Amino acid sequence: GKLKNHHEPVAYLGGLAIYISFLVSLALILSFDQEMLGILLAGTIIVVLGLIDDFGVLSPGVKLCGQSIAVLVLIRSGIYIKLGFIPWYVSFPLSYLWLIGITNAFNIIDVMDGLSAGVAFMCSLAIFVVGVLNDSMTTAIMAASLGGCLLGFLRYNFEPAKIYMGDTGSMFIGMMLGSLAMIGNYTTHNLMSCIAPVLILGVPIFDTFFVMYIRYLRGMSIISGSPDHFALRLRKWRLTTKQTVVASYGISLLLGCAALFIMQLAHLQAVVLIIVLITIALLTGYLLKKIDMTL
């Protein structure tokens, strides 16, 4: 988080610790098939990219090129959106946008101690449950392993943080969660359940679109840094940093539960719930926008 203010130097190698512990835990539990190797190779590319950025400066263009290579590795290994009503020439570009978006979304919300890691843990928990419900044990184990690594990291990342994940960690967990969310089976009961991954990862997705919208209104570049994140606005309103972070955890948990619930509904019921959630998101964005960040 470039928007963080520190009174003391804090190490940025937490992301590398998450990556290594994730690899070790999987090596002890699973045998590696093509899809898993693709996910791990893509994650490794992202980690190298993040380390370079944490210890130097990468232009947005170079960073996007590196992320694109990682996404192409995933698609080549068979990790992409697979829905019967979407042809491959739509699925591949959509998968690319999804993975690039989620990878950067977790980097975008990393503006407070424990925020990105804790939200990512909640997302991992939801994906784990989806994997168990669908008897997809590889997905469940990978999500559980990632969640365990994040929980261990949170002990040292919660306010006041002793270590940060940096771009290395935020982009890595974004790539992992984007991949794992994409390969789950959500549409057993209704086609509208394909929205479940968006709900599971709803907090970083909401913040990304919210920040881009505010910057657009101000005539700024959407990739410019600015203190317009939902978490910073909540803190500006009246919450403390810890209260804001814990509230974000709660919202992420509720969205994960909503995703699991929507998977069990009939089609019409799912449509109604989605409309309600979209309305709540729009109203929340409107209220957050009204908070004056200039004072």
Label each region the model flagged:
Residues G1-A11, F210-K242:
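Cytosolic, membrane-interface loops and tails of multi-pass inner-membrane proteins
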Residues G1-T208:
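"…together with the soluble PPM/PP2C metallo-phosphatase catalytic core" -> "…together
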Residues F158, L283-L295:
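Membrane-interface capping segments at transmembrane-helix boundaries
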Residues S170-M171, L201, L273-I280:
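Small-residue-enriched core segments of transmembrane alpha-helices in multipass membrane transport
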Residues H189-M192, M212, I223-G225, Q243-T244, ...:
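Extended hydrophobic-aromatic, low-complexity segments
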Residues D207, I280-G285:
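Hydrophobic alpha-helical segments of multi-pass membrane transport proteins
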Residues D228, R235-L254, A258-M263:
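Alpha-helical transmembrane segments of integral membrane proteins
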Residues C257-I275:
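Extracellular/periplasmic helix-loop-helix junctions in multi-pass membrane proteins
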